[in-house]
């Protein structure tokens, strides 16, 4: 909410959620190419802060190009709005359990996620198409109940 107050955005009146916080930020500038990039990660509740970003952009004279990725596995939200190819990944893996420690995250291709799963489990793709393999992995039943690996497509828009 501090950023909203700084730019004079009446988020309550406009019904814009500002729940959450910015937990990482970085600024890069290339004067030669007339290019500046402000990157940050936010932790918000259930959905992206895109309406808020649009209001900040208006306050700055519509000078920004805004790209973002929204991930909320508990609600099956895997969405990217990308004006500059900052988020080219095709899928997001949700994973837990000892077998899949450090596997959760975005992957460049479905094939990369499938390959990782095959390496971790020792199960071969065995001629299955990419989509058949994704279905196979997402429906796979593990011996340990606290283990799962799911390949989720990222929707672009």
Question: Could you tell me what each predicted segment is?
Answer:
Residues 1-157:
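Intrinsic low-complexity, intrinsically disordered or marginally ordered coil/linker segments
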């Amino acid at each position: 909410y501090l950023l909203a107050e700084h730019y004079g955005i009446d988020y309550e009146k406009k019904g814009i959620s500002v729940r959450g916080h910015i937990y990482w930020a970085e600024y890069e500038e290339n004067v030669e190419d007339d290019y500046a990039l402000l990157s940050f990660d936010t932790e918000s509740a259930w959905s992206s802060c895109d309406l808020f970003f649009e209001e900040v952009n208006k306050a700055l004279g519509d000078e920004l190009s805004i790209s973002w990725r929204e991930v909320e596995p508990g609600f099956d939200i895997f969405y990217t709005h990308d004006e500059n190819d900052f988020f080219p990944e095709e899928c997001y893996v949700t994973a837990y359990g000892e077998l899949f420690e450090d596997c959760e995250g975005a992957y460049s291709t479905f094939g990369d996620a499938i390959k990782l799963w095959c390496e971790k489990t020792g199960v071969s793709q065995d001629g299955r198409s990419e989509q058949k393999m994704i279905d196979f992995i997402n429906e796979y039943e593990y011996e340990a109940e606290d283990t799962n690996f799911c390949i989720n497509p990222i929707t672009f828009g």
